[in-house]
């Protein structure tokens, strides 16, 4: 029985909807899929699909020639003196050098960022300047939360398919070490009024309106504007509503660290990384992600306290992705142009889909709707996919979407299908680690996921891959890529 509230006790979050279970991650997905939450309305969220058949234009498919990224570094550490332009430019410069592309051939620069630099908000254009590309290359910036760089890739693909461009530099970056800190609205309005004051008495009179409390900085909140809930609170809600155990979440986190550690040790991940030389010294290279823990264990993860719901919660710092700084980039071309220039691309975009749902329902469940749409557009099934790369914002979000994939109830009530999308095979899932271990710079993660998937498909000699990304605002993204 719940303890009675006293005057010294704050109101507590609601208790879990069901008694807590201790299912493993495999059991959650393979045996308990139908405990996933559905709205019961029978009406699916709106989904936008790239094409109803294989994505191809007059000059062939859209080729992803290569991709790379900076190390992904926990905010406030090695990259604290690098802004978002620095990070995007490190990845872009390295990519241009690796591919030996003639900069004069690049038609467009498209980059995603969630928290842009206030002094230079058009990141796509600033990358052109910072990487010494020709000044006549247009630069565009997009913000689709955690799906920003996948949206940048999609915009680049669309530019190629419509003939606007032949070659596009796309990617994203985030510097959460350098998030702009705001003043209160009253302070901001007073400063604006002060800038218009012409005499000393006018300035003094304006300043006299301020009180010390007005000058307190306002820290940015990683929360939904429409619901007021933070990402973590939303993911905690998903864990409860989808009846996901703490054990299963910790198992996903452990898998992420173990696989990322192995892929770092054998060079699979470091091959994709551009070394960075952060200021002020510019003399100490940063060459690897600093969030990967090779010594992680279920026992250590189980000792961590809940982070968002202190009383009933199952989300911890260990099974959630950390705030991270980093940049990423990919080089896109029409298939025809890639062949003419002698490139062997990493792969090709076969289809993609975006979806949007009510953020007050299950904020990060978008991939459960976007993935089946992308698979249908590509003309394939989940069982045809060789590797699955899912962005790990939180382990609860991963398991929620996996359960939706496998659930007959979800398929019928949410997707209008007679059969579920399918059970994700853990042996084909995030095989070189994911965002929980590697890190999650919001604007850079999408391009990292796409590149990481294609590198591993190439190494294994496999063909088809599926990318999924959840994002703030109830957005979901999915892409099918192919190597042949």
What are the functions of these language-model segments?
Residues 117-123, 284-288, 358-367, 392-412, ...:
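Short glycine/threonine-rich loop-to-helix capping motif typified by GTGT followed
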Residues 335-384, 402:
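Glycine- and Gly-Pro-enriched alpha-helical subdomains that act as flexible
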Residues 20-22, 33, 82, 113-168, ...:
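Conserved catalytic cysteine-centered active-site region
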Residues 40, 44-114, 118-119, 123-131, ...:
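Conserved active-site "lid/cap" helical segment
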Residues 167-237:
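Flexible glycine-/small-residue-enriched beta->alpha junction loops
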Residues 142-174, 182, 239-268, 329-336, ...:
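Active-site-proximal alpha-helical scaffold in enzymes
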Residues 19-54, 60, 68-70, 80-90, ...:
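N-terminal extracellular/periplasmic Venus flytrap/periplasmic-binding protein-like
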């Amino acid at each position: 029985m719940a303890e009675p509230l006293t005057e010294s006790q704050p109101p507590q979050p609601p208790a879990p909807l069901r008694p807590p279970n201790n299912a493993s991650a495999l059991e959650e997905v393979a045996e308990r899929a139908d405990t996933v939450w559905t709205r019961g309305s029978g009406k699916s969220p709106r989904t936008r699909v790239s094409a109803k058949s294989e994505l191809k234009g007059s000059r062939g498919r859209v080729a992803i020639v290569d991709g790379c990224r900076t190390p992904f570094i926990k905010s406030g550490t090695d990259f604290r003196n690098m802004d978002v332009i620095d990070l995007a430019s490190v990845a872009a410069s390295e990519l241009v050098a690796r591919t030996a592309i003639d900069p004069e051939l690049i038609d467009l620069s498209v980059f995603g960022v969630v928290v842009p630099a206030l002094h230079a908000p058009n990141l796509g254009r600033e990358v052109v300047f910072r990487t010494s590309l020709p000044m006549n290359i247009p630069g565009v910036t997009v913000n689709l939360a955690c799906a920003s760089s996948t949206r940048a890739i999609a915009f680049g693909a669309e530019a190629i398919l419509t003939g606007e461009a032949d070659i596009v530099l796309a990617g994203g970056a985030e510097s959460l070490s350098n998030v702009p800190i705001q003043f209160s609205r009253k302070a901001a309005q007073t400063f604006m009024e002060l800038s218009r004051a012409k005499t000393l008495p006018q300035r003094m009179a304006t300043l006299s309106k301020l009180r010390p409390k007005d000058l307190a900085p306002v820290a940015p909140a990683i929360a939904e504007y429409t619901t007021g809930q933070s990402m973590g609170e939303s993911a905690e809600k998903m864990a409860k509503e989808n009846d996901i155990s703490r054990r299963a979440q910790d198992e996903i986190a452990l898998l992420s660290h173990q696989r990322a550690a192995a892929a770092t040790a054998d060079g699979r991940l470091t091959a994709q990384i551009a070394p960075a030389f952060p200021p002020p010294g510019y003399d100490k290279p940063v060459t690897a992600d600093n969030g990967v823990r090779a010594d992680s264990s279920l026992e250590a993860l189980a000792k961590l306290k809940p982070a968002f719901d202190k009383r009933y919660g199952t989300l911890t710092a260990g099974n959630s992705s950390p705030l991270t700084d980093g940049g990423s980039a990919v080089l896109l071309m029409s298939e025809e142009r890639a062949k003419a220039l002698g490139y062997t691309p990493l792969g090709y975009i076969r289809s993609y889909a975006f979806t949007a749902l009510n953020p007050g329902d299950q904020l990060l469940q978008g991939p459960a709707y976007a993935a089946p749409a992308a698979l249908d557009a590509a003309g394939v099934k989940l069982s045809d996919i060789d590797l699955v790369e899912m962005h790990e914002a939180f382990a609860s979000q991963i398991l929620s979407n996996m359960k939706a994939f496998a659930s007959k109830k979800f398929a019928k009530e949410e997707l209008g299908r007679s059969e579920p999308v399918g059970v994700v095979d853990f042996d084909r899932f995030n095989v070189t680690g994911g965002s929980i271990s590697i890190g999650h710079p919001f604007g850079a993660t999408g391009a990292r996921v796409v590149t990481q998937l294609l590198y591993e498909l190439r190494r294994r000699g496999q063909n088809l891959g599926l990318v999924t990304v959840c994002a703030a605002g109830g957005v979901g993204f999915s892409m099918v890529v192919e190597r042949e």
